[in-house]
Structures are given as C-alpha cells and as structure tokens.
Amino acid sequence: MHLLLRNLVSWEQLHNADPGYTVVIASMSALAPLVVANLRLAARQANARMRELILVVDCPADRIPDTIHAAVHECSEFMRIRVLGYTDWQHFVTCRLKWGWVYSWLSWSLAIAHSATRAVIIHDLDALPIFPGLFESLYDNWLDSGAEFCGIQRYRGNGVSDEMNLVTTFELALDAGYLRERFRPFDLFNKLRLMEGRLIDFDTMLHVQMQSRCRALREVFQSLLVHPSAVVCQCTDFVAGRTTFAGRSHNLLMLPYFFFLGGDSAMLFTISRQLDRVHRETIRLLGRRLHTDGILPSHWAWMEKQIRRLEQAVVGYSRPEVAEYLAGFIDRAGEFRTVGREIGPLAVNDS
C-alpha cells in the first residue's frame, strides 16, 4: 500500500502566505447530503478572517454530485469556497484500497498543498458546528499557542501516551507552511514505529507531530459542535463490506438525520420504519445489512441527545419527522435516556 501512496500527492513550499486561515473538509461523494449539511452550517459561522474553505471530494471533478455543486453555489454568498477533486489515478488507488484513512490523508494533503494561508483548520465532515464563532476561536487558539499543531482533544490509544502530547486531527489547527517546508505529504500518513520497546501505531499526522517543535491542546466545550466521531470511517468500512458491526457499537444511525439535514429525507423515513420493532437487531442501510445489537442503551441515549442538540440549534425544535425517527432511539435507551432529564450547560430539552 505504501508504494501506491508514496507519490500520490505532492506540494511545494508556501511563500508569501495570505493572512487569516483556511478551513478544510475532506468529503465523500457518496455522502453528498452530509456535505450539504456541513457546508450550510459552516456558512452560518462568523468567518471574518477565513481566507477560504477548501472542499476536497473523493472523485474526479467531473463526477462531483450536482447536489454538492448546488450547495457550494448557495453557500458562496457567505464564504469563499474552492472545490477540489481527485485525479483519475488518485481515484483509482483510493477505490482499490477503500480505506477511510487513505481518503482522509489524501484529501487533507491536497487541501494543505493548495492552501494560501499558513493556518489550516481540519474540519471533519461528520463534525457539525453549532457555535457561530467556532472557527474564529480555533484560529485564535492557534495564534496564541504559537504551536505547529493546536488541537482540541488529546490523542489516546494505539500505544500513544499522554506524555507524547499529541492531539487528534478533528478541528485541528496546523501550520501548513511548516508542513510544506519540512515534510512530504506521505510523511503525514499512518506510521508503525518501535519506540522504547513499544510498538506505536501513529494515526494520520501523529508522526509528524512527534517531530514538531511545539504542539498545544486547547479544549473547547462539546456543546459548540455535534461530532459523533468516526462516522465517515465506519461508513467506509461498512460500504466496503469489511464489517456489519455485529456485536459492536457505532454511530452510523446518525447518518439518516445528517442526510435529512442536507435535504435528503428518504433514508430517515426508511430507517424510522425499521426501528419501529424494538427487538430488531439488524436494519438495511445503504443497501447492506447493518447490526444494531452492539449499541448499548446509553449510546442510543447519547445519539438522541446529539441529534436533538443539532436540530434545536438549526430550527429551534425537533421537527415531526425527526421526533418520529428518534422514537426508536428512546425505546432502546430506556432508563438511560438523558434528554429532558439533565440540568446544566450540556443539557438538552425534550422539544
């Protein structure tokens, strides 16, 4: 695999950088309604210092769905958007590998290569911003930190320890000038390394973080965005046939609502009918059988809370179609349901 990826993308050093920051979204053409939803929410942001948003789609430019082009046209009134596609060879390689980490690495690398600013914010496709000043706050944190990498959450797992001071990629603000001067795009890809007798699986960008002069952690309140992590990677593995998630938890049932938010209600209605049966352990999603038996009641409750938080932020209440969809979540959450029962800044009301 590394032989295929090593020279798949390249970049040049960044000279005469523009002021401000660039927001980057690595998107999937198969999830076009989610792309639409994210763009619309990004357009609601206070983006005074945003130079542009670079949207990278995982297909050649002439195959980008019309729904994405329409959303770009709609949102361009509020922010500058540049759309990039893959070359035919990049598309061939990624389709052959069908691995989420390859798609994200390639798309991020392409965007970093095209950025006109030093500051680049990696905005996950499945992270939906609620707080209108999110991007500006992330940029301020990066400026104040003076770090090459400024993240909002510590990375843990795969042999990585807290002492390494590494941060996750989602909502990560980074110095594109530093990366383009010191590294090749392939250096950002996942790496296995033996360190002090331990095998460490460095996720995307972690190995170059380890070599940086300074990285910083600036946490933000979870209420500023709705981010059911790994939705895109889970969807890639599911569609590729690598898993049906039997006996495993997942966030794929956030997708029907995300599609609804992006103007496609068909999946929401289809899954709503399938969730009517409380004890049903599989459903049909994206043409494949998906197991739900590994989702714990507490996680059904958490997903309901995230959907309602986003729905209330967008329209002020839960629309009837969404409330009907969430009925299946409520049945499965049982006594673990938190909506309407909590108090405090992270509480979500039952409306």
Where are these regions (language model features)?
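Terminal low-complexity segments of carbohydrate-biosynthetic enzymes
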Residues: 267-351
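Conserved donor-nucleotide/metal-binding helix-loop-beta segment in metal-dependent transferases, i.e.
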Residues: 132-158
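A conserved hydrophobic helix/loop-capping motif in glycosyltransferases and polysaccharide synthases
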Residues: 21-31, 45, 56-58
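Short, well-formed alpha-helical segments that are part of the catalytic scaffolds
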Residues: 31-46, 67
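Catalytic core and acceptor-binding pocket of nucleotide-sugar-dependent glycosyltransferases
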Residues: 171-274
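The conserved acidic donor/metal-binding loop of glycosyltransferases
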Residues: 124-128
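Short aromatic/hydrophobic "clamp" motif used to bind/position activated sugar donors
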Residues: 120
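Active-site-proximal specificity loops/subdomain of glycosyltransferases
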Residues: 63-114
